[in-house]
Amino acid sequence: MTKDYLFEIGTEEMPAHVVSKSVKQLADRTKKYLKENGLSFKDIKTYSTPRRLTILVEDLAEKQEDIDEVKKGPAKKIAQDKDGNWTKAAQGFVRGQGMTTDDIYFEELKGTEYAYVHVQKEGKKASDILMGMSDIVKAMTFPTKMRWGSYDFEFVRPIHWMVSLLGSEVVPVKLLDVVAGRKTQGHRFLGDSVVLANADDYEEALKSQYVIANADERKGMILNQIQELVAQHNWKVNIDKGLLEEVTNLVEYPTVFAGSFDEKYLNIPDEVLITSMKDNQRYFEVYDENGKLINHFISVRNGNSEYLDNVIAGNEKVLVARLDDAQFFYDEDKKYPLAHFVDKLKNVSFHDKIGSVAEHMARVQIIGDYLGKKFNVSDTEMKDFDRVSDIYKFDLVTSMVGEFAELQGVMGMHYARLIGENENVSVAIKESYMPTSAEGDLPSTTVGSLLSIADKLDTIISFFGAGMIPSSSNDPYALRRNAYGIVRILLNEGWSLPIKDVLPELIQLLSGKTAAKLPKDAEAENEIADFIRDRVKQQLQVEKYDYDVIDAVLASSQQDPIQILAAAKTLQMHHDDADFKPVVESLTRITNILKKAKYRNANDIDESLFQDVSEEELYAGVNALEENTDLSIADLYKGFVELQPVINNYFESNMILDKDEKVKNNRLAQLLKVNNLADRMGDLSKLVIK
């Protein structure tokens, strides 16, 4: 027999961002607990609101299965001493089964007698096992916790009630002074408490008390109501998934409504209005049918439609107060010339161990000028870069960014446009911060891409130079995000940048032109290069390359992210080709021979020492590949496919480790040339070949 089991934790209002994760945690911990205790079930459904975390275990077995089995113990000669007394081994064996030595009997197995016991145990009732739900609640973790009363216990918010029903039977789980029963609470203002006759009554009973316990159903209600409202007015709304999730977890009974504000505020940049509405008030911004932001917003009330006019008026009043502040900041900032703000950056600390923001910008310009030449950026774009690198952080000291820190770069773009900076310069100010997350948008302009890379590269160099290097668990200055941003932009632009090769030149250029500490030696420079190169692995994982392909390409000495990605594409593309296995096996054989011989010297090859035509053929083939300076990774692989029979013939026709030392070293030098070329693709020995 099976029954459904309902368990609800009723709390004070929880922060919206923890609700979904917390109910999932409750379900996962319960699932593990039930499996460990041998209680079978069909599935676990979750319900959650700001005031409750609930699970419904479907078709839970009413008891554990009875145990009726024979357990084998130690051999008789170990279970008893020579006088027939029970040893500690025998006593430990029966103790583990909950039995005594009187229960032991012996049977022969393959010529040896062993101790056995016949274990018969009635399974525990589910109601007894479910009393352990209190331990599950105690074990739950949260980003922040609260204590209440005099209890030595923490939870996300104080617990006021619990429901624990196995079918129609109360399982009186106790936590602190709260004993679980069958009474749950409806909406704080619209509903009453409700007594549940059965676990299956939960969802419908709460609906009668203005609580939609199913989060997906609440989300669907919100979306449907928004769509109805939008259709009535010919509006458009961009549904932000994060905001939708948040408002879903802010309400128990959603009612969508629309409000408005004076059109005069539309002179403020859209991003300011959207931030005021979305981030501060949890409103959805509204657009007309042409995609232009208009003076309306959509919000969600935690309740029904009664007195909705009062709710709308209250929300409009709060928003207008915020927009008045934004208008004031916007007007104040426009009173001053750009130079007024730029000059202030001399007194704004980038970091107390690194210097001012103005010094950071100066270093960024040096780095960008150097990289611009490497990337063949046009003279016109370099002129724009030099201009924007002089000013791009100016909005940090504006009133608007002081109030809305998340708009740094965005406000710089708008203010730059207002004073007549060209579009390349204006947009690059905003794009210097891109990408703002692992999946964030990348710069759309060459100048923006160059500025963003230079900014991030200086940040990494400066913090590493000052000894503030991220640990495996701590990265307070988001240096990994900066490094990953560099990699993503390089790949997006198709810019070749062998990090380890250019760092010494860059640091030399910066020396003497900054008060910030710089990496002091080649080891420190290599640490930075490896840190950035490690982010290439992240990109390869995002693009879902096979793990062995990733391991292979990252084990090469290649420093250029573009070339590493090209190698991954090539190896992945040809992985299932008929000629892939023989090519990889030939090249791996070369690597293994060189390792065994401990041969690393790049000696010149003496053609006069060749003793077989196969040596001449390999020499010519490798030279042809080496001399093609524009050879792509894809073409290099094709070259090795064509060269594979030549390599095989070389092995068949020559004793590599010849008795003649000169001949041996000459042949090893030949193989080293091949190996160095193959290393451009990766360490092929790491590939899994089927």
Swiss-Prot record:
Q: Its Gene Ontology biological processes?
A: arginyl-tRNA aminoacylation; glycyl-tRNA aminoacylation
Family annotation (PROSITE patterns): AA_TRNA_LIGASE_II_GLYAB (PS50861)
Which GO terms of the molecular function aspect are on file?
arginine-tRNA ligase activity; ATP binding; glycine-tRNA ligase activity
Q: Which UniProt keywords apply?
A: Aminoacyl-tRNA synthetase, ATP-binding, Cytoplasm, Ligase, Nucleotide-binding, Protein biosynthesis
Q: Matching InterPro entries, A to Z?
A: DALR_anticod-bd (IPR008909), Gly-tRNA-synth_bsu (IPR015944), Gly-tRNA-synth_heterodimer (IPR006194)
What reaction does this enzyme carry out catalytically? tRNA(Gly) + glycine + ATP = glycyl-tRNA(Gly) + AMP + diphosphate
- Tell me the compartments it is located in: Cytoplasm
Subcellular location, principal: cytoplasm
Pfam families from the UniProt entry:
DALR_1, tRNA_synt_2f
Q: Identify the enzyme class.
A: ligase
Its Enzyme Commission number(s) read: 6.1.1.14
Of the GO CC terms on this record, one is:
cytosol
- Which NCBIfam families does this entry report, sorted A to Z? glyS
According to its UniProt record, which protein family does this protein belong to? Belongs to the class-II aminoacyl-tRNA synthetase family.
Task: Give the matching HAMAP family.
Answer: Gly_tRNA_synth_beta
* Quaternary organization: Tetramer of two alpha and two beta subunits.
Protein name stated in the entry: Glycine--tRNA ligase beta subunit
Organism from which the protein derives: Lactobacillus johnsonii (strain CNCM I-12250 / La1 / NCC 533)
Q: What is the lineage of its organism?
A: Bacteria, Bacillati, Bacillota, Bacilli, Lactobacillales
